[in-house]
Amino acid sequence: MAELATIARPYAEALFRVAEGGDISAWSTLVQELAQVAQLPEVLSVASSPKVSRAQVAELLLATLKSPLASGAQAKNFVQMLVDNHRIALLPEIAVQFEALKNAREGAADVQIVSAFPLEGAQLAELVTSLERKFKRKLKPAVEVDSSLIGGVRVTVGDEVLDTSVRARLAGMQAALTA
């Protein structure tokens, strides 16, 4: 996967520089849509077919988008460049890296919160507020429920993990007892 990230990085950075001249959120939506479309097996098979021209593949990708930016020259050029260089499969990684650049500019980060029980609005808001103080940046939460944690939460921000789950504590106790 590191290789895909390395290849996708220049595309994400170039697109981000273009987006800085306009609405970064709109460009983020566009690249997310492109990433979703590019993952469809039907699109990948059409894109790899020798019977379909590169211009037709680019038109197909742009036609599936809902974003108003899709009709702009910059979006068309970006998609055409990806098609010409056989980089459509990179779109999901380009979207991930574009989002990381957007978050870095906003001083924000995505946070994955896994809880043993569903978190209600007030609980989630309080947890996010305390995590923002701890990590010293604005956080965008994505919440999952995993009953195997037994209790507590596991929080992932970038490459940092904060695991306060009962399952993690039990695993720590087991390791201490068997050592």
From Swiss-Prot:
The gene is atpH. InterPro entries: ATP_synth_OSCP/delta_N_sf (IPR026015), ATPase_OSCP/dsu (IPR000711). It comes from Burkholderia thailandensis (strain ATCC 700388 / DSM 13276 / CCUG 48851 / CIP 106301 / E264). It comes from the Bacteria. Disulfide bonds: none annotated. One of its GO terms (molecular function) is proton-transporting ATP synthase activity, rotational mechanism. The lineage of its organism: Bacteria, Pseudomonadati, Pseudomonadota, Betaproteobacteria, Burkholderiales. F-type ATPases have 2 components, F(1) - the catalytic core - and F(0) - the membrane proton channel. F(1) has five subunits: alpha(3), beta(3), gamma(1), delta(1), epsilon(1). F(0) has three main subunits: a(1), b(2) and c(10-14). The alpha and beta chains form an alternating ring which encloses part of the gamma chain. F(1) is attached to F(0) by a central stalk formed by the gamma and epsilon chains, while a peripheral stalk is formed by the delta and b chains. Transmembrane segments: none annotated. SUPFAM superfamilies: N-terminal domain of the delta subunit of the F1F0-ATP synthase. Its main location: membrane. This is ATP synthase subunit delta. Belongs to the ATPase delta chain family. It is a peripheral membrane protein. Keywords: ATP synthesis, Cell inner membrane, Cell membrane, CF(1), Hydrogen ion transport, Ion transport, Membrane, Transport. The keyword S-adenosyl-L-methionine does not apply. F(1)F(0) ATP synthase produces ATP from ADP in the presence of a proton or sodium gradient. F-type ATPases consist of two structural domains, F(1) containing the extramembraneous catalytic core and F(0) containing the membrane proton channel, linked together by a central stalk and a peripheral stalk. During catalysis, ATP synthesis in the catalytic domain of F(1) is coupled via a rotary mechanism of the central stalk subunits to proton translocation. This protein is part of the stalk that links CF(0) to CF(1). It either transmits conformational changes from CF(0) to CF(1) or is implicated in proton conduction. It is found in: Cell inner membrane. GO terms for cellular component: plasma membrane; proton-transporting ATP synthase complex.
